[in-house]
Amino acid sequence: MSLPVVRLVWLGRVHYSELLALQEHWLRRLQADPRPGTLSGTKAGVLLVCEPAGPVYTGGLRGGLTPEETTRLRALGAEVRATGRGGLATFHGPGQLLCHPVLDLRLLGLRLRTHVAALEACAVRLCELRGLQGARARPPPYTGVWLGERKICAIGVRCGRHITSHGLALNCSTDLTWFEHIVPCGLVGTGVTSLSEALQRLVTVDEVMPSFLVAFKETFKCTLISEDSPS
């Protein structure tokens, strides 16, 4: 039996707004097709991957940022955006691998809960491939992947009509001081870390990408195909 096919779109370093616009484009395409899988042959959706070009704080469905917080964060030179994903406030920026899978869960045999678990397993597997054996997922409200008491990968998703959006953010060489201006994901008393900090050397998004794609294919049990046009 052939594996579901997911289209891979590597955007490189782009502004967060460009990622959201492309995500919305693919959401409309997949949700408009009443028969799963017929839009693009056997494709189960698209995997949008990028490195954010600038600092941006985002709020989720469980809570955003107050007007006062928004003003303060923008004064730091960061963009502030409300999103439709689950979770609370977090940070995205250069040195971070940002992955938004826009997938038809029916074609992957997944439900929302198992989709989130697969994203966590993908990040854990990536850490293992990079030589970090202690990464683990934790139950809500600690959704994501952790090294000890520090989160290395944040996860927040949305799902409507079986189609997912948003996804995971893995800190590779992220400037972690940006997280000091918020309570990441609303979790008081916890910290954040990165692959660079854990491995004590510079680990770039470009270096991590091959391991990430291996981990994604393993955990989602799919085939990835790369195409030139993102749309």
Curated annotation (Swiss-Prot):
It comes from the Eukaryota. In the reaction, the free carboxyl group of octanoic acid is attached via an amide linkage to the epsilon-amino group of a specific lysine residue of lipoyl domains of lipoate-dependent enzymes. Pfam families: LplA-B_cat (PF21948). It is found in: Mitochondrion. Pathway: Protein modification; protein lipoylation via endogenous pathway; protein N(6)-(lipoyl)lysine from octanoyl-[acyl-carrier-protein]: step 1/2. Its main location: mitochondrion. Its EC number is 2.3.1.181. Keywords: Acyltransferase, Ligase, Mitochondrion, Transferase, Transit peptide. It catalyses: octanoyl-[ACP] + L-lysyl-[protein] = N(6)-octanoyl-L-lysyl-[protein] + holo-[ACP] + H(+). Catalyzes the transfer of endogenously produced octanoic acid from octanoyl-acyl-carrier-protein onto the lipoyl domains of lipoate-dependent enzymes such as the protein H of the glycine cleavage system (GCSH). Lipoyl-ACP can also act as a substrate although octanoyl-ACP is likely to be the physiological substrate. The record marks K151 as: Lowers pKa of active site Cys. The keyword Transcription does not apply. The active site is at C185. This is Octanoyl-[acyl-carrier-protein]:protein N-octanoyltransferase LIPT2, mitochondrial. Substrate binds at R85, G86, G87, L88, A89, T90, F91, H92, A154, I155, G156, G167, L168, A169. Residues 41-224 form the BPL/LPL catalytic domain. PROSITE patterns: BPL_LPL_CATALYTIC. One of its GO terms (molecular function) is ligase activity. The gene is Lipt2. InterPro entries: aa-tRNA-synth_II/BPL/LPL, BPL_LPL_catalytic, Octanoyltransferase. The modification N6-succinyllysine is found at K43. GO terms for biological process: positive regulation of oxygen metabolic process; protein lipoylation.
